Amino acid sequence: MEFRMSKTSPSHFFNYSASKKLQELAKHPLDLTKELTPERVTQYVAEAGGFKLLYGTERVTNDVLAALKQLSEESHALDKMNRMQDGEVMNFIERFPSENRPALHTATRDLFDYPRTAKKAQEAAQLAKAELEKLRQFLEKNDQNYHFTDLVTVAIGGSDLGPRAHYHALEHLLKPGHHVHFISNVDPDDVAGVFRKIPDLKRTLVAVVSKSGTTLETATNEELVREKFRQAGLDPKKHFVSITMPGTPMDNQEQYLKTFYMWDWIGGRYSTTSMCGALMLSFAFGINTFWEFLKGAHEMDRIALETNLNKNLPLLAALLGIWNRNFLDYPTVALIPYSQALLRYTAHIQQVDMESNGKHIDQQGIMTNFHTGPIIWGEPGTNSQHSFFQLIHQGTATVPVSIIAFKENLYGEDLEFQGTTSQEKLLSNLFAQSLALATGQISENPNKTFLGNRPTNILLAKKLTPYTLGALLSFFENKVAFQGFIWGINSFDQEGVQLGKVLANRLINEFANQRKKTKPSSFAIGEAYLKHLDHFS
């Protein structure tokens, strides 16, 4: 079978007239070391939904912004966002086998003012609402009986990264007496370590999450956890709930106390506002807190439909990212939250972005002739300033930086020291980094020279609340989707994980064959890897 990887996409992106304008503009980008002024910092700001996006320290001019807006129009980015939120099939590759389904995660929070009127979106929202009601009744009963105090979630990938990141972000709101534990890695030490922290298995609930009901790592960890309960003389069925699609092996009343549903139109990395996140976040913080989280996500979904670019924060951020990636040729982005509560947030957005847009073919199945998703990485500030910011300031590669920040801290506990509070010191540091990266410094000592022109943007809100956290999630989800729409790629599948799974299963069979000592090897190169383990016998 001939695969058309040798051909490149002939019809879009660099052939847009806006792209040609941007290529010309990129030959002489704005020099931030000369052009950054107080007026520019004041002028280049977009505001919506309680957030301000400060982008005066990006290397853009009004001409660049006009061309970027034109690019979004030529690629029909807003139309595609509307179609996605209406439930049209957006997860597809033309003429090749693909998942061929909607990407309707927005329906899981489309439960408030101005809901979508398209039939598929309404039907999906009603399904999500029914599951939330089922969850409310389940948790209400548990609270009345004060039965389960600890929750263990067994999941992997987006079913783990997203909920876990948002749990840490809201941990200051944890209900008294409640504790949450996470198991994801198939490394048995993950399970063993968690169970050393659980005080009473009798009062422990386990939520197993797998859309397909067959995820190998999750199934393996589930069996390890079930064995812990059996060893304690407890019936796992009375402690286990499942979150899966209807009809999967995990949709089984004989094995689970309760089953909550998700659907094939929700991708794992987009599943935090579905039951994947709802059960754990509602158990930990209460369902009203989760409801506020959904409200924030819904509001940013609506903002993503704004035709005014200066109010459509996700689209503007997407276009700034495309300018940096495709026209200034910066291959990576450091995502730096100046909030310790967001210590796992970059890991989640890393998956949302890189699994969505790490694609080398377009939706016609043709190899792209342009770069797609950047490498996303980072850690919270100010800690990161004392680790990898040296490279960002003086390294040979230009690394754009996206900063998340809040005016106020979470607990309201602070101290004035040497004339300022800790929060003021935090804010001073993040603004200083943006300024230093943009303007640089000239010195007679070359070791103290900073070249500048390192672009940054700052997403700023008053305070991290359940509402703003939901909006923040939607901001990044929609930003990533917009970039995929403009590039013409499928942001909603993840074939890149499949080949490794196939080969891992062959190696697993090789381990099993060696244990049985009955079958000769059918996977010689795999056997060659395993022989290295014999050295440690």
From Swiss-Prot:
One of its GO terms (biological process) is glucose 6-phosphate metabolic process. Pathway: Carbohydrate biosynthesis; gluconeogenesis; Carbohydrate degradation; glycolysis; D-glyceraldehyde 3-phosphate and glycerone phosphate from D-glucose: step 2/4. Its EC number is 5.3.1.9. The active site is at E355 (proton donor), H386, K501. It is found in: Cytoplasm. Gene3D superfamilies: 1.10.1390.10, Glucose-6-phosphate isomerase like protein, domain 1. It catalyses: alpha-D-glucose 6-phosphate = beta-D-fructose 6-phosphate. GO terms for molecular function: carbohydrate derivative binding; glucose-6-phosphate isomerase activity; monosaccharide binding. Its main location: cytoplasm. It is an enzyme of class 5 (isomerase). PROSITE patterns: P_GLUCOSE_ISOMERASE_2, P_GLUCOSE_ISOMERASE_3. Keywords: Cytoplasm, Gluconeogenesis, Glycolysis, Isomerase. SUPFAM superfamilies: SIS domain. GO terms for cellular component: cytosol. The keyword Cytoplasm applies. Belongs to the GPI family. Catalyzes the reversible isomerization of glucose-6-phosphate to fructose-6-phosphate. This is Glucose-6-phosphate isomerase. The lineage of its organism: Bacteria, Pseudomonadati, Chlamydiota, Chlamydiia, Parachlamydiales.
